[in-house]
Amino acid sequence: MCDWIVYVIENKGYTYVGVSPDPVRRLRQHNGEICGGAKYTTSKGPGWKHVCLIGGFDDKIQSMQLEWAIKHVPPRSAGGLMNRLRKMVTALSRDRWTSKAPLAESVPLHIEWHQQHDFGEYVLPDHVTETFIQEAALRPSV
């Protein structure tokens, strides 16, 4: 059984939300180090970094439901990292991420922050916990 992760990445003011069982490998794909990155991210060039990883899903479908919900919080045209993070908190605070998703409170999630953020005061639902990772600990050993 593999754990599916929803991730938020950022590069030069652009953001992207995706799902992967291996977000480190997926980030390498987005940065063009190995093949398979999304067209959107490869067109923006290398330099993508994880902002946060969200885990705790029971299966791939649940992670994809949250990914969809984050991408569809209105207004969809509002870009930038701060707006993306606000949309993420909004999606996490819903009773259900989609009409067919389980009750959000039945899926205990954990956010692992990889970048400092300052998008104002926010309140996560009780079923969501968070930790902050030191940047030095993020670098993969060679």
Give the positions of each predicted feature:
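Boundary/linker segments flanking structured domains
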Residues: 1-2, 64-67, 71-142
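Glycine-rich phosphate/pyrophosphate-binding loop shared by adenosine-nucleotide-utilizing enzymes
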Residues: 4, 48-49
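GIY-YIG-like beta-to-alpha core
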Residues: 4-40, 56-73
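Short amphipathic alpha-helical leader/targeting segments
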Residues: 32, 44, 77-78
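Short, flexible turn/loop "capping" segments at secondary-structure junctions
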Residues: 40-47
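Solvent-exposed beta-strand motifs enriched in subsets of small alpha/beta binding domains
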Residues: 49-56
